[in-house]
Amino acid sequence: MELRSDASHKENVSPKPAALPKPEQRRFRRSLGIGLSGRHDQWVPGCQVERGGPAATPSPGAVLDQEPCRVQTNLASPGPRLGLALKDTTGQLVNSSFWQQSNLQSLARRRQGKAREFAIQQSNLSINETSSPHLCPEPGGSSGPHKLPWGPLLSQEPLARPSSCLRQSGLPAPGTPSGDFRPTEAFAPLDGHTQPGLRSWGGLGSWRSRLVGEPLTLEDLAVPSQNQTQAPSRAAVHQLLASVHCLAQEAARLRCQAPQEPPGAVQQDLWTGGGQPFSAHPQPSQPVLASSDGRRRRLRGHRETAAFLETPASLSDSWAQSKLMSPETTLGTRTKDSLNPEQGLPPAHPLGSGDSCSPWSQDGRAQRGDPSLPRGVGSRGTDPCSSAFSNTAWGVSPKQKGEEGAPRERVHREEERTAFHLSDTVPASSASKNKAQNITAPESEAICWQLLSRCFRSWRHLVKRQREPAAAAVALGRWQLLRKCLQALWLREAQLEAAWGQYTKVLLVRSFREWRNLALQQKQVQPHMQAGPGSPPSRRAQGKGLSLGRSTVVDPAQRSRLEHTSPGSLREEEIAQRLLSHPRQRTDSRHERVQILQALQLAVFFLWCQQKKRARQERETLRKATRATQRTGSFPQAWHSTAAGVAWVAPLSPQHQRAWLCRCFGAWQQFVQRGSRYRDHLADRRTGTLRKCLEQWVRMKQLRESDGAKVTQLSLCRQKAGREAVYTAGPGACGLGAVGQAQGQQEQGRGSLQDACWTLALCWALLLWKMRLFQRQWANSFFQGLQQRMLQRSLRWWHLRALGPDATSSCTKTPSALEPLSSSTLQDSLEKVPRAPTLPDTLQGSLLWAAGQRQQGQCLLLWQARAQQFQGTARWYQHTRQRRIFLSWSRWATAQWAWRELASHRAWDRTCRAVLGLWRQRLLQSRLVEWWAQERGWRLARDALCHWHSCWQGQQFLHEKCQTWVQVHLQGLQKVVFRSWQQAAAHQRCTVTRPEQLLLQSYFQAWCEVVRDTGVLRAQHQAFQDGLRRRALGAVFATWREAQEVAAGAQEQRVAQASLARWRSCGQQGQEDGQQKKARAPQAFPAWPVAPGMHHEAQQQAGESAGAQAAQCWTWCWALWVHESCRGQVSRAHASWKPRAWVLEASVQSAVRGGVQRAILTQLRPAELRRFLRTVQLRVRLGLPGAGKTRSCWTQATELVPPAPSLQCSLGGRRKPRGTAWAQRCREHSLCPAFQLWPQWPGQSSWVPGLPLWTRDQGPRAHSSPEPRACKAQSKAHKRRLRARSCRILEKQAQAHGSALLLALKGHDALGHQEEVPAAPVPRGTASRAAGFPAGQVPGSGMAALGGCPRGRAAGADPAQGVAPEMGLADVVAADPATASGSAVTAAGRWAFKKWHQRLAARSPRRGAASSPRPWSKPGPKGPESGQEAARAPRGWGLGAEHGAQLQL
């Protein structure tokens, strides 16, 4: 027969009271590779677990393996079929051709229209790969953890009743488990685990506990060998089942023939007006459900629900007891309340939709649990729908049941009610007859069945009741202790943090006071030190402030006091060094630790004070420098002095301060190294743990792969062996479902690969389970002790840290685990079980008794195995939970300590970094200040140089503009003067000789060419000077810039070295030298730009003075000549020769001079010039004595005029240098500085400095150039005639008159430049008249030389000869001093000059175009050929030579 789908059963394990888990419990734990869910107190129907709903989580076995194991499963398919359900590594089912029992009905074979129905199954592995045994109800709504699921079921349909045959016999249907079989509960926890059972089931047999989630093996399912008899054959079992089926059918037929009474009247009496059911008679078979009136208490409701779920067999047991015992016995032994004993057992009634069952009595004593009733009876509800009754018991298959629908079901339930209430609805007159029929032989079997169930139920409830309070008390005590410990630790930690903060503030204040007292003492001691014997202290020692430990004049008592109060004492230093070298060792006492801490804090405070002092000094220095710069506008001299270096180095000079700074940085370095070592150690530990876990995981994977290969090989070997695999398994390794199959296969006598695989899988699963059990037990024992030791150590460490080494370690004691309960209770309860009465000797009674005993033994064995499994699971779960709780707490404590240590280390690290950062910031600020000062100095110097350069450029531009204006103005004046002279000469034009006209024309042409060449040379000279000045300035500026860059680089290097030396106290002297050099550099810089300006000003002043004098002389000469030419006070000869000799030579000389003379002319205003001309004109016109000053003007003008080029040729034809003597005379004159300032033109080596341009030596270059175009136009005949005529005229005049001046000039030309010209004896006072003039510089000497003979024949002429009136300049020598000075002109002189001028004017019209004078606007040929052509002229031709030289100039 098959299981009935609508039969229900309750779980025999009660769930724990629901309680919300703590956050610490929800935390996921990992220990030994086991993962457990924290939601172990929440319960859901097992169907959700089986279906893999959202609340279902994998079991511990699934978490351990992470893959399905190759083990046996009894849930191969929805129905019985061939095939072995073996799991491979992919999770798929491997079918094999062997028969296997299936206790789960297919979901498709159930009815779709029925409400929630629960089926019974024996499951080791769920269909959906859930490895924990559980019930699988039909899909439907789930109820809460404390709400019974039977209310909706009872309210939707009438309760099913068993047949009368089965009720009389008390036997279950064949092929179905009995009512005492204890399946798993319908509500499973969220993690897939069942609630742990008892721990004292070990006395029922040699069953070993195993892990939750691991499948049952053959050893678990089989009967122990020592208590097991030889299993009957398959034929005997089939015969027994067939006979029982026939007896059941016969009993049902007999029951159906009995008279029946309609139950309608009885049902109407059982219901109240309010629609609520009310039972007036005790009905043990009626289930006790949770009422909706709310009279249950929370704890009592929990316990009743747990007890109800523990005893799923109470329904059938109570019903069997009511049928076995009489009404009087039932009322007296079970209820003992206000039930009427005369009415007997009331008939059961069907409940309609929406109805609910009421308690047994009105006062609810049975529901609350009467103490007089046995345990598990009064407080539990029973369900008449026992698991022993299935659909097959009534001859209805599931398929037919689904097809017939509601009518067939209604008829079926009516037959059940009729058979069930047969003996209860008969009238009172037939009571004795019904009583005789009820008391039959099968009732004795029901009594045994009921007593056995009661014993087990009572024992289970008692053990549960004894265990739950103790476990709850222990758990509660542990949680309270853990909570109190954590609260105490947190409170202590907060107190310590607050105390530490306050203590730190107090220490800081105390250290500051000590330091202030120490500073005051040092200030008081310092005057004594300075006033003591010995040499006076140096200036550097006085500026260092506090110098602890360096005083040599302090008395011993005061020195000892300073050493004791100084933070750098030797004892503290030794202690600190020892602590730094051994960081894990503690100090001798707490007082020493406090002293060390104070010393470190004082050192940090000293460092802070020193930095503040340095910052203050730096700000003062910067403020002083800023004020000095703003006040003076230049750099202060003390900016780079040694005072700044001393101020920086002085605070670090004391030895104790340096020592403490070194110790502080050493301590910080040790601290950082210690933190790095700690982090490395933690990383190594974590790496080792991960490596070990990885190795274990790899080993497990390798074992699984090897297991698969071995299973395959063994299966192939067993396939060849055939039936030997079945015989080797033995009877002790076979389960309930496998016994008949194995025997059937033995009888068939054939083997297959599926048989071998099945047997091998069973054996391998058993070995694997044993190995894992041993590993689990060993790991539990080992890690339990390890965790206890770790917990004790961590708690002891916490106490030592929080309360000190003298504190007690009471909190480290952990509550001991409860000892496992002994099995004496179970044995006593089993001993009290009443013996089964003797059975009748009839065949039917024997067979029924034998089958019942067999079924009872099997169920008992399975129950014992399941109880032992629950016991081991409960113990392991409790130990695991306890271990994980304390392990998590210890880990949390360790993590908190590590984080706190890390936070303190990081705080100290930040403090040290802040100190170093502040020091670096100050150093950077100082460097920035120095750099700013240096950059400002460079910027000011650059600005000054740029300003000077711009001013110089402006001056040069103004100078060029002034030169241009002067040149243009001078040219205009010259043109006006010569145009006026030309006009005067045109009015007085007369017939003159041709040579004189040509001579006059040559003079003017030469003057124009000289003016042109002088302008070109002046422009070239000015450009060259400007280029020289620019190049010189550029070179000087580049040199200065390079020097500044080199000095800046050296300065930066010196600053960096000085900064390092200041910190290390090693470079004080080098810093002082560097700052002295920096101080001297700014002092020398301002004087450098002034030097070129001063030199330029000196040159300009000298040029102005010299130019002014020269311009004044030149202006005087021109003004006098204009006056004489206009007034006619001098002779015509004198007026005609004066521009030729004096004015023209002076103009040429002034034109040749440089830009100095032209620049000076710009300073002469037109008003001053006009006033000067008017003054000279008035003096000459009135004949005042002051007019004689014009002689000095002539003298100055003629003294400055160098000899003409014709005078450079001697009478003998030899050329002698004459520029040296003339230069000597210029140096002796007052205008010599003007000529000395004239620069030397580059490339002219023969040019003597200080001489005009025409005094240079022509050299051989004079003969290399070709003849000018003007000379080529003249014919050779004209040249010879001109020379001959000129020579004759001059010789005749010289012989006739004997001009003393001409002879003197000739003698001067003959003697040379180095010889002095002797004073020629001149008759008639001629020598006396010329005595006022230097040799060769008599006025008109240049023009008089034109008439000299080049052959020197007149050298020895008589100077006493008279002066002819027709000679041009002879009357000048013969005249008196007044006439020589220009104040009076003789008539003879005027007549002679007039005659000569007339001849010249009369001769000019008769000449052709070739001999006509060249107009002024068209000067002669230009270029360097002019000066070279003069050199090629013949040297011995007198007037012709002079004419040629003047023409070329």
Swiss-Prot record:
Residues 123-133, 315-333, 384-394, 426-437 have a biased composition (Polar residues). Residues 1-13, 400-419, 1258-1270 have a biased composition (Basic and acidic residues). Pfam families: DUF4684. Residues 1-32, 123-201, 258-298, 315-437, 523-551, 1257-1278, 1399-1449 are annotated as: Disordered. InterPro entries: DUF4684. This is Uncharacterized protein C1orf167. It comes from Homo sapiens. The lineage of its organism: Eukaryota, Metazoa, Chordata, Craniata, Vertebrata.
